[in-house]
Amino acid sequence: MYECTHQEPRWKVITDAVFPTSLTVTGSRFYVGSRRRRKGFFTGLLRQLVLLPGSDATSRMCTGMNFNLAVLSIPKILQDLPVKPAGNGLLKYPYEADMKVTLGSRPPCTKSESGQFWFNAAQKGLFICNGDKWISLLEVEERLDYLEEYQSLATNSETMGIEVFVIPDVGLFAATANRYTPPGSAIYKWTDEKFVAYQNIPTYQAQSWKFFTIGKKIFLAVANFEANERGQEFSVIYKWNYRKEKFTVYQRINTYSARDWEAFVIDGEAFLAVANHRKGNNHNIDSVIYRWNARTGLFETNQTIPTSGAYDWEFFSIGPYSFLVVANTFNGTSTTINSHIYIWLSGAFQLFQSILTFGAADWEVFQIQDRVFLALANSYDSTIVAPNNSFAINSSIYELNITAQMFVKFQDILTYSAVDWEFFSVGEDNFLVVANSFDGVTFAVNSIIYRWQGYEGFVAVHRLPTFGCRDWEAFTTAAGSYLMYSSAKEPLSRVLKLKTF
């Protein structure tokens, strides 16, 4: 049995040998957090004390007189008092029936499984259900081994961009921005571990999709590059209809050879930025920032920004500051032009920094620990003359220098008409994959996965055969992690599964 006296704690004693399970302790006294009768009461915080439910001495335990302090140190699951047995049976704890450990593949995690454990023997991980999802308690971090082709997805036509998104309680989707109308662009739903056709939407040489939400409203915006049959040029915002479980037309916005939409929130207000590429043959036109009007339920013009063949917008925040960076591709005479980073000040975006780019097609912002990076995809250098290759040029990674208050070049990577970067993580490892689209001779070019290796920067680890690669998207399901890429040169997109160990 146990006997407690409220005195100062003993020194910690670590035995040299394992405590034998066969040793009888009947009639023994254990002093927990006490120095017996030497000095006063023990008022410290006792940590790492585990009592076995149903032990015969539990009822003899006494805690400190400061009960508020004692509550702080007792796990919630152990705070219930034991139920006294009717006879001489063992003490019963009301939570014991819920302390179950499940083996095998990932079981469901709902309110009825809340508090239960799952041991993943394959990945050597222990998880607890919080009533919604499995939370890792102890897990061996996954490492990327290789990739295998998982699905070849036949698309309506060549695909200029992909957007993967999740609608709560409905599922995982992928929207493809397809070149031709008819048949337009398609939305696919992840069903039985594959993407299957779900909805077709009329589009006009669609370039990209953007998924976003405002409160409970769910939207999907398409950037149309061409005018419709009646010569009207606009891009469209679609809204999710919960009853029909389909996207329906919500708002049309006049655009000019739109390449990209970017959705973001600043101080609780929702915005949309469109990258207008050209108007006729004029590439030096305004791109537009729209603000959501909660009263009318529509997006309205908030600001115009001069751009040159704008291809992509990327929004990001650093602390209290919000930024928007544009990829300028062509000014009518050259691809060697500045792309600009803007900062939000006094209700509008103002120029923060200009960076020389070469047919810039994409920006990708990402963070590794407390370091912030911007990856730039350069597609073409018009200043290079034959026999040199204008498509084999460096794309660059920039890092925010807090002291200098600007982005400085961190690393150059040789790419082949790069048009997209995608950042993703596997376990504790971070990766970048580039979409190489053309090497000056062929569209059959390897796209490369680079792994972050600290002082070395990003190092090539996987070479993936692609054809006219245009866009990469990373996503994860309960069955694993995937990369999906689109081709601008064939009506086929591919899903690759990440194999880990």
Give each language-model segment a name.
Residues 187-190, 234-242, 286-293, 338-344, ...:
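Beta-propeller blade signature
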Residues 1-137, 143:
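Extracellular glycan-associated modules
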Residues 123-124, 130-136, 446, 466-501:
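Blade-level signature of beta-propeller repeat domains, shared across WD40, Kelch, NHL, RCC1
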Residues 144, 151-163, 200-210, 233, ...:
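Repeat-based blade/solenoid architectures
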Residues 107-110, 158-170, 210-216, 262-268, ...:
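Structural signature of eukaryotic scaffold interfaces centered on beta-propeller domains
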Residues 179-182, 225-230, 277-282, 329-334, ...:
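Short glycine/acidic-enriched loop and turn motifs that connect beta-strands
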Residues 112, 153-183, 205-207:
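Beta-strand-rich domains and repeat architectures in extracellular enzymes and scaffolds
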Residues 94-103, 141-157, 192-198, 302, ...:
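A short helix->beta-strand "capping" segment at the edge of beta-propeller domains
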